[in-house]
């Protein structure tokens, strides 16, 4: 993650012949899960079409692999159970490799670097008495807060994170850095004059990867090779520029 990327948030709290051509007729469709209402990573546009950074990276990977992919949007907390049960092939979401997740699913190579941010009123610190922290249910941030014994306010989707702070139900929010981009688009949230700081915890920063069904280990090599190709041929950078105001790889 570049310094320019961090500064942005703290201030505003295929080559020819590769991956082109017809899809392979002998390959069944892959079921890909994305997170519902998690802009700018995955969301529905004005026509109801699923899009976003993670969604379009997944589509590019499918194209490189020459397979047909079917996308389903689910809540963050549903990703791990569905993947571990083999009910989907790929989770196209920025998942940090926590011990619990590694015991249940496989991971592709990283597609971006992630850090977490603590957003709260000045003087409000993690673990402070009386502070309730907004998190997304099923996220690494929720698991961390519960481990610390913090009172948390869990919401179903990233797009709902602003509401607990605006209403006063929560006094802080712990979020992935990229999620903070969308929070800052909410006028009522901006008017709270909250302070954004990088949250220093090894469990909440590092490489973010797609999840892979434990029943489809052969996909790991294919996905990783496709990811390398879209980074080399410029597709990755074009998607990055379309959805994010800074480089994440």
Residue ranges and their predicted role:
Residues 38, 55, 70-81, 138, ...:
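Short helix-initiation/N-cap motifs at beta->coil->alpha
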